[in-house]
Amino acid sequence: MTVSSATPPHKTRILVTGASGFVGSHFLRTIKDDYYIYAVGRRKQHASGVPVQENIEWLRGDLGDEATVQRITEHIALEGGVDYVFHFAGFYDFTNRDNPEYTRTNIDGTRFLLENCLNLGVQRFVFASSLTVTRFSKKDIKVTEKSPVDATIPYARSKQAAEEILTAGRE
């Protein structure tokens, strides 16, 4: 874990996972001036195109490693926790074949994150799933959270399993 800042100001504090990925880095660039951000990514901050600012604390780590998730969340807890979690981290390899990384990152990483965020004072946990989890509908029929699932490829199955972990954690 690498830390690039240390003192959270009075702003609303958020945790963003997948900060060095496509969705996470774009999200960070959009909100970068409005919050104190704990940004978790596998790559270095400069490699992600996320600006270095006092209100962005870059925490380098792999969510598939439970000890790393524990260290990151313990660090955040010592600084007062976070108000919101935006979980964008995930693995996808474009082959549609089974890959153990789907389980390690998408399923186990989500479970590790959820379990370790329980003591952070989180008001809302936002998870970026995938449309591939749902059955593709006929033209002009909306897909919602209540749409039937039809995860047929390994990536979609891993995202569906992560959704189930989060749903069980909410109850």
List the predicted regions and their residue ranges.
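SDR active-site strand-loop-helix element
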Residues: 17, 40, 85-89, 125-130
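A short, basic/flexible loop-to-alpha-helix module at the beginning of a structural domain
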Residues: 1-11
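Catalytic helix-loop patch of NAD(P)-dependent Rossmann-fold dehydrogenases
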Residues: 104, 139-171
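N-terminal Rossmann-fold cofactor-binding loop
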Residues: 40-45, 63
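N-terminal Rossmann NAD(P)H-binding glycine-rich loop of SDR-like oxidoreductase domains
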Residues: 12-34
